[in-house]
């Protein structure tokens, strides 16, 4: 899956650029969203901070315990996106973070509001990040699917028990 990108430097650079742009967009939007909540919907502020934080910690601990090798370790091939981390592949914390931020914006925003549409855009960006992480050889498909499932379960629990 990574061969076309490892064999074509321009394609690899474009893939890395897509990864950086999507990641930066998600992780710049989140603090702007939290800042916006400080001035408008304070009742959702704590939830919007706690949900991603708790999930991030839980996924980090889970990854440490599982310590699954990454594709570039297992298949002894260089990743397309520079990465030298060993183990801790499942679930993808990068993808989990993008999805839980997107889901948090969705569940804490009124339906069909501009913020809700921002949540939809963030979900699309998270999906692109997931694809790029697999195509670049830094995660298995199951790593990014697992990250999505972890984020979806956390968002569901928050929706059922806290909203």
For each predicted feature, which ranges?
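Hydrophobic alpha-helical transmembrane segments
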Residues: 1-3, 40-44, 64-69, 88-100
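N-terminal transmembrane-helix/juxtamembrane module of multi-pass inner/ER membrane proteins
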Residues: 1-30, 59-87
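Hydrophobic core of alpha-helical transmembrane segments in multi-pass integral membrane proteins
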Residues: 27-37, 123-127
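Interfacial segments of alpha-helical transmembrane regions
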Residues: 33-58
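Membrane-water interface at transmembrane helix exits
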Residues: 35-36, 59-67, 106, 158-163
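Transmembrane helix-loop junctions in multipass membrane proteins, especially transporters and channels
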Residues: 39-42, 67-72, 137-142, 163
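Alpha-helical transmembrane segments of multi-pass membrane proteins
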Residues: 51-63, 125-133
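Membrane-embedded catalytic cores of phosphoryl/pyrophosphoryl-handling enzymes
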Residues: 76-163
């Amino acid at each position: 899956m990574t061969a076309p990108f490892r064999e074509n430097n321009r394609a690899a650079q474009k893939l890395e650029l897509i990864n950086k742009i999507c990641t930066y967009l998600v992780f710049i939007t989140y603090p702007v969203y939290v800042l916006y909540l400080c001035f408008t919907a304070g009742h959702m502020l704590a939830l919007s901070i706690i949900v991603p934080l708790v999930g991030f910690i839980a996924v980090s601990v889970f990854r440490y315990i599982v310590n699954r090798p990454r594709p570039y370790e297992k298949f002894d091939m260089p990743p397309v996106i520079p990465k030298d981390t060993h183990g801790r592949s499942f679930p993808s914390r990068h993808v989990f973070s993008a999805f839980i931020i997107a889901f948090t914006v969705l569940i804490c925003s009124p339906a069909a509001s501009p913020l809700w549409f921002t949540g939809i855009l963030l979900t699309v960006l998270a999906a692109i990040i997931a694809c790029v992480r697999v195509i670049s050889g830094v995660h298995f498909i199951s790593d990014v699917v697992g990250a999505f499932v972890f984020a979806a379960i956390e968002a569901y629990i928050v929706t059922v028990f806290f909203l």
